[in-house]
Curated annotation (Swiss-Prot):
GO terms assigned for molecular function: ATP binding; ATP hydrolysis activity; ribosome binding; translation initiation factor binding
Underlying gene: GCN20
Comment field (misc): Present with 14600 molecules/cell in log phase SD medium.
A GO CC annotation given for this chain: cytosolic ribosome
Organism in which the protein naturally occurs: Saccharomyces cerevisiae (strain ATCC 204508 / S288c)
Name this protein carries in UniProt: Protein GCN20
Length: 752
């Protein structure tokens, strides 16, 4: 019989030699164990052989050949073991020796255990007792082998990427920001000078969670300096693609720095401004090194005075000083290159643009809410100016003034931006190109903003549908002729000609149809005014700390009002006063006694029992209807089929929002009070919401950051700022321009 080595190398000749060498060594080791009575009783040969077989297959060996190899090796080892058992002569009681070994293995000292095992005549290794066998494998070599295997498997599968909470993500939870930053961006500042920062990732697959594929044989191309909007329906995998890029699960060049605004900043005692400055790890390290060198130079000046001028000690100090001076010059040059002296002013400008006052910038980060810490994360990323900036729904955490600032900032951003967003106005302002993720692929619309993309996409779809329909008609015509004359002697030649034509026609797939969702708010009966009226309303913790002062606002049945302003200026508070959830310190709130209000909060999910279905939750929270009536009502908001019967924890964010819209309409409201209704809805959902609000015969009052939704629905703009709420004369775009002009006058937009 051929040796184990020759068998393995013959069966796995195409894979990396380091893997075959490891397999040969492992099998030879198993062979040696068959001569040891104690160890042979502790090893399951079939399990061990299968372990090595799986390793060979993962490295690229043929499954059929490996199966044949494993059967041969297992048969050989089993036969060898039986023959050796008959020849072995053991001294003493074997079971007693095994008991002694198990007792020893519970001892604390590994070195003592291994010595004791040796004295018993058992060649054991406590480091590998989990496998109950000795292994002489070099762990470093094994790690190297596994890395090579992984690379080969990736190459064989066209850079297949399976993303399921990668190790790197888990590591981030355990380590600090600096370590994670350096792990993702290992190259020092300035090391990428002269290198192309275009990104081209060819033919890769992307999976998520339990193996669901979201991209198949896809290509990703990002030209340096372009700003890409990544769009697609909710749940299509856009955020997963960003995470795979940010963790370098995909093959992004190492010299391209990456930052992903994904998680809110952890709060501590660091001031907001300093936390932004600290985000640039390279600058932080250079400044720290500079400070250490300067401290050492001061120490050397003191030491020098203790020695004679021509002494050996002074010469050593002078040599050290020369080295440190040279190093200090290098550090200084790098700090100049990164304009370190302007860093604080730039960081302050970014923070101010995102809504942090000068006073707030000096507050510790742990004093801010989660939403404001998300803004800090965004500010830190903007300050660092990575080569590739990844943003996931950035406008969801911002108000209209901050979104306006962010859009202006990104329009002059010198590097590459890839942002997921459903905010049309934001994408129209920012994006130079659109990437459309759908049907496990990425389609590129170069040089197009969102509106142009939307029009072009629809034209492409119509053209594809027209081409498909025409071919189906032509195919039918050819097939009818063939069926009619195939066996007709006079026409058979023509029939054969048409058969050839039919065979040569390209196979066209029916064009993908965009999913449509319909929202329908129920009609309400008319009411006589006043509907909701606020007169000289003031609200605060006390009269010396008023959040709102002397507010006058009138909401009618035909009102379409947008309430805008910076976060924290009292917009949601005003809604709660109108809902009678809060009482004003002074002033009057008049409401029609027959008034019914549908109230949508931005935290609507908090009030839902996600462990139940939408139908069950609605029947418990809003009793009085049959399950069939609840299902029909949910269908008016796109929750159709079995969706209403599934546990709500299985629904997407957009689907949960639609359940919330359905719930608020159960009482046939006269007025819809909506607090950030566009959050979690994709473009299709937003279109449906806008149309439904346009057709609603009651009044609408909304707080929203989505300029497109406001422009499409609202006729009045009311601005909450500095404790007042006043009507703005103009459109939402006029208000946006007013915000930018004010920021520009203060030097905020220009400074960055």
């Amino acid at each position: 019989m051929a040796s184990i080595g020759s068998q393995v190398r013959k069966a796995a000749s195409s894979i990396d030699p380091i893997v075959t060498d490891y397999a040969v060594g492992y099998f030879n080791h198993l062979s040696g164990i068959t001569f040891d009575a104690v160890q042979s009783k502790q090893v399951d040969l079939s399990t061990e052989v299968q372990f090595v077989s799986d390793l060979l297959i993962d490295a690229g060996a043929s499954k059929a050949k490996v199966k044949e190899l494993s059967e041969s090796i297992l048969k050989q080892l089993t036969t060898q073991l039986k023959e050796n058992e008959a020849k072995l002569e053991l001294t003493g009681d074997t079971s007693k020796r095994l008991l002694d070994i198990n007792v020893l293995k519970s001892h604390n000292s590994k070195s003592d255990i291994n010595v004791s095992l040796s004295m018993l005549g058992v060649n054991g290794d406590i480091e590998h007792t989990g496998r109950k066998m000795e292994t002489r494998v070099d762990l470093k070599k094994l790690a190297k082998a596994e890395q090579k295997i992984a690379k080969k498997v990736a190459k064989r599968n066209n850079k297949f990427v399976k993303y399921e909470a990668s190790k790197l993500i888990n590591d981030q939870k355990e380590e600090d920001y600096d370590s994670f930053f350096l792990q993702i961006n290992p190259l020092e500042f300035g090391s990428s000078a002269g290198k192309s920062k275009d990104i081209h990732i060819d033919t890769f697959d992307l999976y998520v969670g339990d193996g669901q594929r979201i991209l198949s044989n896809a290509q990703l191309t990002l030209s340096f300096g372009h700003r890409y909007g990544l769009v697609g329906q909710n749940g299509i995998g856009k955020s997963t693609l960003l995470r795979a890029l940010s963790r370098r699960e995909l093959n992004v060049p190492k010299h391209v720095s990456i930052l992903h605004v994904e998680q809110e900043l952890r709060g501590d005692d660091t001031k907001a401004l300093q936390s932004v400055l600290d985000a640039d790890v390279w600058r932080k390290q250079l400044l720290s090194e500079e400070a250490k060198i300067n401290e050492r130079l001061k120490e050397m000046d003191v030491l020098r005075q203790e020695f004679e001028e021509d002494s050996l000690e002074v010469k050593k100090l002078d040599n050290e000083r020369e080295d440190l001076d040279n190093h200090l010059i290098q550090i200084s040059d790098k700090l100049v290159d990164m304009e370190s002296d302007k860093a604080e002013a730039r960081a302050a400008s970014i923070l101010y643009g995102l809504g942090f006052s000068t006073e707030a910038q000096q507050q510790p980060t742990n004093s801010f809410s989660g939403g404001w810490r998300m803004r800090l994360s965004l500010a830190r990323a903007l300050f660092c100016q990575p080569d590739l900036l990844l943003l996931d729904e950035p406008s969801n955490m911002l108000d209209v003034p901050s979104i306006a600032y962010l859009a202006e900032y990104l329009k002059t951003y010198p590097n590459t931006v890839l942002t997921v967003s459903h905010d049309r106005a934001f994408l129209n302002e920012v994006a130079t190109d659109i990437i459309y993720q759908h049907n496990e692929r990425l389609d590129y619309y170069r040089g197009q903003d969102f509106d142009t993309f939307y029009t072009t996409k629809e034209e492409r779809r119509k053209n594809a549908q027209r081409e498909y329909d025409n071919q189906m008609v032509y195919r039918k015509h050819l097939q009818e002729f063939i069926d009619k004359y195939r066996y007709n002697a006079a026409k058979s030649q023509e029939a054969q000609s048409r058969i050839k034509k039919l065979e040569k026609l390209p196979v066209l797939e029916p064009p993908e149809q965009d999913k449509t969702i319909d929202f329908k708010f129920p009609e309400c009966d008319k009411l006589s005014p006043p509907i909701i009226q606020l007169q000289d309303v003031s609200f605060g913790y006390d009269e010396n700390n008023l959040l709102l002062k002397d507010v006058n606002l009138d909401v009618q049945m035909d009102s379409r009002i947008a309430l805008v302003g910076a976060n924290g200026c009292g917009k949601t508070t005003l809604l709660k006063i109108m809902m009678e959830q809060l009482r004003p310190l002074k002033g009057f709130v008049s409401r029609n006694p027959r008034l019914r209000i549908g109230y949508f909060t931005q935290h609507h999910v908090d009030s839902m029992d996600l462990t139940t279905s939408a139908v069950d939750w609605m029947s418990k929270s809003f009793p009085g209807k049959t399950d069939e009536e609840y299902r029909r009502h949910l269908g008016s908001f796109g929750i159709t089929g079995t969706l209403g019967l599934q546990k709500m924890q299985l629904l997407s964010g957009g689907q949960k929002s639609r359940v919330a819209f359905a719930a608020l309409c159960l009482n046939n409201p006269h007025i819809l009070v909506l607090d950030e209704p566009s959050n979690h809805l994709d473009t299709t959902g937003l279109d449906a919401l806008v149309e439904a609000l346009k057709n609603f015969n009651g009044g609408v009052l909304m707080v929203s950051h989505d300029i497109s939704v406001i422009d499409s629905v609202c006729k009045e703009i009311w601005v909450s700022e500095q404790g007042t709420v006043k009507r703005f004369e103009g459109t939402i775009y006029d208000y946006r321009d007013y915000i930018l002009q004010s920021a520009d006058a203060a030097g905020v937009v220009k400074k960055h």
